[in-house]
A protein has these predicted regions:
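Helix-to-loop junction immediately C-terminal to a conserved catalytic motif
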Residues: 60
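Conserved ABC transporter NBD signature motif
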Residues: 68-82
Length: 282
């Protein structure tokens, strides 16, 4: 499999050193050293409960590490860091939610993502630009409760991009979306990567993004492996990681991981070896 692009050789936007995470009495994993460069796309894979989302929460300053350190753009990670954008899993808002699409995006622009807005000069122009950028300008005045899941997720991405973040954390952002919306959301995220943002993308299904991925962090059973997709998505590597037989199978243009204990779904790949992504670097 060929990679669509290569991460630029620049100082790390994310530095994790000697990190360990614990949930109650159970250690999720330990000894993680990770650098993410500007413009790098890192996929985080593994079964439910392996600590993928908890890792994102730690980077966001919401979950303390049990050991180690996290630095974002050279500074210790902390809650409310506006150098970080966060795209959550798509969860439909209640149909009676009356907030306009514009107002949801504005929460990322006006100085707070919670509580009352703090208007600033130029906010409306910035919101308009974000709505246009995520393809949501034509429903900016509609109540979000009346929008489809894909339309709502575009707004969440717009909110995450409000401060032009240097690091973009994505937690299962394609879950529950149809193929067209998966491609649209992935394209928006990749555009931010092309502008220099590092991307951490948690997913159970690597298929929609594998053509963009530079490296994979695969976490399972309190252990992890880090490398390129070609290095990680191998039967031998995943069998060693899980401690039981796991098979990476090719079926035409698809790559499927089977036999992984407690994994939700499979990882499929529809990117042929001689195919390049439409927005790939030369």
């Amino acid at each position: 499999m060929s990679r669509a692009h290569h991460a630029p050789e620049r100082a790390s936007i994310l530095e994790i050193r000697g990190a360990a995470l614990q949930r109650g009495d159970r250690e999720l994993w330990s000894g993680l050293d990770l650098d993410v460069a500007p413009g790098e796309f890192l996929a985080v894979l593994g079964p439910s409960g392996s600590g993928k989302t908890t890792l994102l929460r730690s980077i966001l300053g919401l979950q303390p590490l049990s050991a180690g350190s996290i630095r974002v753009d050279g500074r210790t990670a902390q809650r409310g860091d506006r150098r970080i954008g966060y795209v959550p899993q798509q969860r439909p808002l209640a149909p009676d939610t009356s907030m306009r699409a514009r107002d949801l995006v504005a929460l990322g622009v006006n100085g707070t993502r919670f509580g009352f807005p703090l208007p600033r000069r130029g906010d409306r122009e910035r919101v308009d630009a974000l709505l246009e950028g995520v393809g949501a300008a034509h429903y900016a005045e509609r109540p979000v409760g009346l929008l489809s899941g894909g339309e709502q997720q575009r707004l969440r991405v717009g909110q995450a991009l409000a401060d032009d973040p240097a690091l973009l954390l994505c937690d299962e952002p394609l879950s529950g979306l149809d193929l067209a919306n998966q491609r649209a959301i992935t394209g928006i995220i990749d555009r931010q990567r092309k502008q220099g943002a590092g991307v951490l993308f948690v997913t159970h299904d690597v298929n929609p993004i594998l053509g963009l991925v530079d490296r994979i962090l695969y976490i399972a059973g309190g252990r992890f492996v880090l490398g390129t997709p070609d290095e990680v998505l191998q039967s031998r590597v995943l069998t060693e990681l899980y401690g039981t037989a796991v098979f990476v199978l090719r079926a035409g243009d698809r790559l499927v991981v089977v036999g992984a204990p407690d994994a939700e779904g499979t990882h499929a790949h529809e990117h042929s070896a001689d195919e390049s992504h439409p927005g790939a670097h030369a």
